[in-house]
Amino acid sequence: MKKFNKRDQPLYPIIIIHKKRKVIPTTKEPTAAQLEQRVKFNVATKFHAHAKEMLPVIICKKKSLDYKTRFTKMIHHCGFTGSYPDYEVDYSQLQLTTGNLSELFKSVSRDSSGVLTVTWEYERWMGGADDTVNLFVYNSTAKRSYVFGKIALRHQEEMSVEIPGSDKDDVLHIWVFFKSPDHKHISYSKYFSLEG
């Protein structure tokens, strides 16, 4: 009698068939909590569409993939202000950048023509004179965003920039931060808000 040997048997492919489950649409009305969650998600997603334009300026060398994922999570977890259905992202809780460079930003002001002026402190002993100043502005009234990369150097201690299409009554949310010339280091962002 011939012995059964596994090695002599031909191998056959194993086919697994997944039957697609039919989803039956529900006739139930969404709960109040579900409606709130949908509005919050929609608000966060719309802001993310604006904020992601800043990623090329924010990202340091060799950190792009990690930061893109983390950035999305940060926006969705920074909280909301207002009440249903008029929620807004709690912009003050969003730390746009984190890093080891000192930031020392002092103030942001706006004149009647819509020009923003940002000031900061600089001392020679601190080093980093050629760190670049970068700015992200979100106009929550007009739902517009503006990215300004490398608009000044740290040693200049002040810079001004015009926000196109901005009305003096618009609410502006501003994040400003430093980045090293070699794109390897970045500072914590500083948040400012200008009410209309």
Question: Can you say where each PLM-predicted feature lies in the sequence?
Answer:
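Charged linear interaction tracts used for macromolecular binding and regulation
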Residues: 63-196
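Long, polar/Ser/Thr-enriched low-complexity segments
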Residues: 1-102
